[in-house]
């Protein structure tokens, strides 16, 4: 099996890059996709998921694949369906699809439509539905921490079972390389429920800086997203899913990470200490 060629979509992101690293460590041949400029000697190939350009070449001679829709697209089905259809056409040995926690709440959502298409494809598959990522605080939400020492979000006091993207990647890599849990979907979470005040306190402890959480209006975040160049449709999507978070829909933890990896998931304290330099 270790001679199989595994294709990783989104290979330059937090999750995809870690999936690539783990697969290489296990002896698999890997190929990653990116929309960015590719350096010489890289194991990456260029794919434009919006147009479909490069998908056929990327999947050439591939045995297994990890599929995801990158940030920036609110109609994830239009991104994922061509990938699922190509995987089906090539009869891949295993496909792992990442959507999000709650994607199966309605059959009409773009993510759920993609899940159903994969479930009905006849392929061996797994679906991974992670809760919100801890790494959002050192990427998407980091500007307020740098400029004001504040996490600025319309999240209320809702608790969240945040998960570390390193655990998400480890689960994906494990499922890609085994058929033990074939044709199952897994909601995956971190080990604890925390609110954004608790996250701010953990970042403060890790950095020695005073970081606080300040609730803002959804309209304020929406304006900030638009001014930073986020497409209107995707900004609306972000506000909508944060609304679900605020209502408590992400207050979920379970034992699926430990069930699959045979170890406990990474908690808030380790995350904050490992990424402290991002907030200095």
Give the ranges of each region predicted by the language model.
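Active-site regions of enzymes building and remodeling cell-envelope glycoconjugates
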Residues: 40-50
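Oxidoreductase cofactor-interface core, primarily capturing Rossmann-like NAD(P)-dependent enzymes
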Residues: 2-29, 36, 50-52, 60-63, ...
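A hydrophobic C-terminal alpha-helical subdomain
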Residues: 11-12, 32, 219-280
């Amino acid at each position: 099996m270790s001679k199989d060629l595994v294709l990783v979509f989104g290979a330059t992101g937090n999750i995809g890059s870690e999936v690539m690293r783990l697969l290489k460590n296990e002896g698999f041949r890997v190929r990653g996709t990116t929309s960015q400029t590719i350096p010489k000697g890289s194991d990456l190939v260029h794919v434009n998921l919006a147009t479909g350009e490069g998908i056929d070449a990327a999947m050439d001679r591939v045995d297994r694949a990890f599929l995801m829709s990158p940030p920036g697209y609110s109609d994830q089905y239009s991104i994922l369906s061509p990938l699922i259809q190509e995987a089906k056409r090539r009869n891949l040995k295993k496909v792992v699809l990442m959507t999000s926690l709650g994607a199966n709440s309605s059959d009409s959502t773009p993510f759920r439509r993609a899940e159903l298409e994969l479930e009905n494809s006849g392929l061996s598959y797994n679906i991974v539905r992670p809760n919100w990522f801890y790494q959002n605080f050192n990427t998407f939400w980091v500007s307020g921490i740098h400029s004001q020492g504040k996490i600025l979000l319309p999240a209320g006091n809702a608790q969240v079972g945040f998960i570390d993207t390193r655990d998400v990647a480890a689960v994906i890599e494990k499922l890609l390389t085994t058929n033990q849990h074939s044709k199952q979907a897994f909601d995956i979470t971190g080990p604890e429920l925390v609110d954004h005040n608790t996250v701010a306190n953990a970042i403060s402890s890790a950095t020695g800086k005073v970081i606080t959480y300040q609730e803002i209006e959804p309209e304020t975040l929406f304006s900030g997203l638009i001014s930073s160049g986020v497409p209107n449709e995707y900004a609306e999507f972000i506000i909508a899913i944060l609304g679900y978070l605020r209502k408590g829909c992400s207050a979920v933890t379970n034992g699926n990470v430990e069930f699959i990896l045979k170890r406990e998931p990474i908690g808030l304290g380790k995350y904050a200490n490992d990424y402290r330099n991002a907030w200095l």
